[in-house]
């Protein structure tokens, strides 16, 4: 009796395979919000990824058209709830350009500080949750330790830890507390030591390096064609940062570097955000040195609310206050767009004015919506486990996606 060794079937006629579709979300820890991904897989390998958005649609763009320009400040920070000051600043800059408003130097400096603190806050959430998605629990607590300290600074200035609504057309809602600059300086001292810890736990972790290096590569030309911005674009070798390319709030007077990588993979996107934490701290330290006493609002009473002290002595101030609160100001007819650099990329508010007290049209250029379009390109051909890494490295915020 002879025996033949058993061999697995290799002929296409004998081996039958089929594509399996898998739902990821809309409630899934890795999406950090309500995002549904339909993933087509051939075995363990991804053949297609289709994002289904809209679960967090708020209708903010349309809401802006039914609110005065002053009331719009309330809605802007809720679009990206991790870098609230990014959208808030982009909105008021567009309205100020439409009006030709003059923002005092002190208000501009405070805006820069809060803008960069907001970037730090967003990147800290990215660092903590990005590693958590890959199974590393410890960095989450380290990053959220500093995140809570940043939110304490926000609360000290404007009373809110999130969705602050602190900026105003023409300046700020109120001045910062006297001890706030000292608190910021003390935070930066501990924060920069914390970044060293993140690099030890995060950038030098061999397991993480194996999961992220060479995974989800987005080449330079593809990143440009897809319209990516922010760290996702700079990780692919394009040194575009609107703080340098289209300066606003005096960023051209600050000394800082724009981190760039040529790798284009998930590891590069993680590493760039770590480097940006240090650059933001550098900018804030410079802003602290140039913070001088002065006004915090445009003196034009047809734009800015008069201080409470004037309301007790001036009938003209009472009239201006009444008109601004009940009706708002009337910008000239025209359209405007000011690009800014948020934690996720280019944020801009395209505003059309018909001369009324409310915008005729507001279009929000949000980076997360555009950046998410790169997900399929980065995932196809890789394993399903890599999808979680790639999605975390793109760092979308769903409020920024759906609007």
Curated annotation (Swiss-Prot):
Give the highest taxon in the source lineage.
Answer: Bacteria
- Where is this gene product found? Cell membrane
Q: Does the keyword Nucleus apply?
A: no
Pfam families noted in UniProt: Complex1_49kDa
EC no. given is 7.1.1.-
What is the recorded membrane topology of this protein? Peripheral membrane protein
Function of the molecule: NDH-1 shuttles electrons from NADH, via FMN and iron-sulfur (Fe-S) centers, to quinones in the respiratory chain. The immediate electron acceptor for the enzyme in this species is believed to be a menaquinone. Couples the redox reaction to proton translocation (for every two electrons transferred, four hydrogen ions are translocated across the cytoplasmic membrane), and thus conserves the redox energy in a proton gradient.
Task: Give me the segments passing through the membrane.
Answer: none
Which Gene Ontology terms of cellular component type are present?
plasma membrane
Task: Report the PROSITE patterns cross-referenced here.
Answer: COMPLEX1_49K
Q: What interactions and quaternary structure are annotated?
A: NDH-1 is composed of 15 different subunits. Subunits NuoB, C, D, E, F, and G constitute the peripheral sector of the complex.
**A GO molecular-function term, please?**
NAD binding
Keywords assigned by UniProt?
A: Cell membrane, Membrane, NAD, Quinone, Translocase, Transport
Q: What is this protein called?
A: NADH-quinone oxidoreductase subunit D
Paired cysteines (S-S):
none
HAMAP family, alphabetized: NDH1_NuoD (MF_01358)
Q: Which family does it belong to?
A: Belongs to the complex I 49 kDa subunit family.
Q: What class of enzyme is it?
A: translocase
Tell me what reaction this enzyme catalyses: a quinone + NADH + 5 H(+)(in) = a quinol + NAD(+) + 4 H(+)(out)
Q: Which SUPFAM superfamilies match?
A: HydB/Nqo4-like (SSF56762)
């Amino acid at each position: 009796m002879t025996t033949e060794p058993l061999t697995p079937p290799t002929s296409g006629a004998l081996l039958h395979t089929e594509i399996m579709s898998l739902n990821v979300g809309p409630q899934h820890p890795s999406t950090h919000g309500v995002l549904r991904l339909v993933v087509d897989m051939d075995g363990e390998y991804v053949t297609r990824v289709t994002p289904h958005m809209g679960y967090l649609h708020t209708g903010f763009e349309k809401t802006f058209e039914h609110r005065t320009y002053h009331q719009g400040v309330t809605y802007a920070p809720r679009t990206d709830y991790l870098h609230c000051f990014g959208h808030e600043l982009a909105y008021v800059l567009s309205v100020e350009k439409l009006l030709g408003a003059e923002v005092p130097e002190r208000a501009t400096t405070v805006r820069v500080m809060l803008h960069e603190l907001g970037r730090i806050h967003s990147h800290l959430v990215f660092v903590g949750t990005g590693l958590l998605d890959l199974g590393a629990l410890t960095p989450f607590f380290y990053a959220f330790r500093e995140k809570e300290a940043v939110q304490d600074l926000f609360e000290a200035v404007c009373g809110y830890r999130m969705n602050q609504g602190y900026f105003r057309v023409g300046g700020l809602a109120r001045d910062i507390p006297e001890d706030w600059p000292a608190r910021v300086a003390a935070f930066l001292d501990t924060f920069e030591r914390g970044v060293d810890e993140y690099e030890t736990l995060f950038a030098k972790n061999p397991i993480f390096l194996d999961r992220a290096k060479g995974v989800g590569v987005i080449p330079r030309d593809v990143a440009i064609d897809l319209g990516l911005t922010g760290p996702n674009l700079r990780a692919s070798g394009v040194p575009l940062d609107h703080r340098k390319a289209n300066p606003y709030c005096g960023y051209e007077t600050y000394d800082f570097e724009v981190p760039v990588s040529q790798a284009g993979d998930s590891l590069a996107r993680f590493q760039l955000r770590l480097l940006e934490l240090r650059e933001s701290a550098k900018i804030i330290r410079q802003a602290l040195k140039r913070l001088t006493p002065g006004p915090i609002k445009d003196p034009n009473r047809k734009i800015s609310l008069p201080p409470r002290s004037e309301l007790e002595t001036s009938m003209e101030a009472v009239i201006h206050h009444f008109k601004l609160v009940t009706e708002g100001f009337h910008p000239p007819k025209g359209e405007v767009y000011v690009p800014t650099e948020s934690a996720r990329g280019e944020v801009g508010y395209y505003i059309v004015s018909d001369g009324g007290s409310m915008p005729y049209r507001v279009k929000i250029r949000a980076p997360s919506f555009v950046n998410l379009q790169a997900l399929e390109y980065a995932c196809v051909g890789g394993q399903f486990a890599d999808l979680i890494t790639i999605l975390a490295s793109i760092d979308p915020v769903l409020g920024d996606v759906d609007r």
